[in-house]
Structures are given as C-alpha cells and as structure tokens.
Amino acid sequence: MKDKTQTTAGSWALQGSLVPRDAFVVTKLRDAGALLLGKATLSEWADMRTNSYSEGYSGRGGQCRSPYNLTLNPGGSSSGSGSGVGANAFSFALGTETDGSVISPAERNAIVGIKPTVGLTSRAGVIPESAHQDTVGTFGKTLRDAVYAFDAIWE
C-alpha cells in the first residue's frame, strides 16, 4: 500500500521505503470498494533465511504469534495475514505464496486460504521472490470471505 506506509518485507534493510503506487491487487480491492486497514507482519523477505528463525519472524516485526496459542508457530511467511484473520481482526487478507505461505497459515489458524495458480493474480507491485512460484492469494475466516476477496483480485 502506498498511503505513506513503509514497504519493508519485514527487513531493516528497506527501512523508510515508500512505494510510489499500490500493488495492482490492492488497486483492484480499492476499486471493488474494500476498506483496507493496513499491512500485517510477515517472515523477513517472505522467506526463511535460516533454520534458527521460525516462520513468521522478521527483524522489524519480531515473532508473529498464533491467535489460538501464543507458543505455536503461526506458519508461513504470510503469518500476520493468517493470524489477523484467525483472530477476527479483519474478515479477509492477502498473502503471497511461493512455498506454503498461504496454505500453512490457513491450516494453522483454522481459516480458509486460496492459493491460486501462478499468473491468475497480478504480482505487479509485490516484492518478488520467485518468478515461477510467487502468487497472490487470499485468506478469509469463511470460504465466502476468501472468495469475495479473491473475486476482486483475479485477472
């Protein structure tokens, strides 16, 4: 999101980074009338950089926690989105999947995650990890919530 919100991928290396425009999927959500509340924490660089850090950890945001059990790993790099929906903080969220980053938080937070086929949703404006695997998906507390959000962003 471009609204004077830093885009750091959870890393101090991008401290102060402001983007000139919304990611295409964010623009599509706005055009569909969605009220966007902000950004959620994620694993640094949307990936596990070392085995000594758990999923959901970033230098900027610390360790994301499961809303059901603070000692459990919330799963995947999109853990903040999954945990936020699981905690009923918001009805839907976006997540990017390269290798389990939508599926794992959905499973661990008892929510619905839609991981689309690569290319079905735009990655324009998303910090890339893998051109052949990255895809933007949705989370919802219910299937209806996840599908409504997905319907707004697919191309």
Language-model features and meaning:
Residues V85-G86, R108-I111, I153:
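Mature extracellular/periplasmic domains of secretome proteins
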Residues T98-A124:
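Glycine/threonine-rich beta-strand-loop-alpha-helix active-site module
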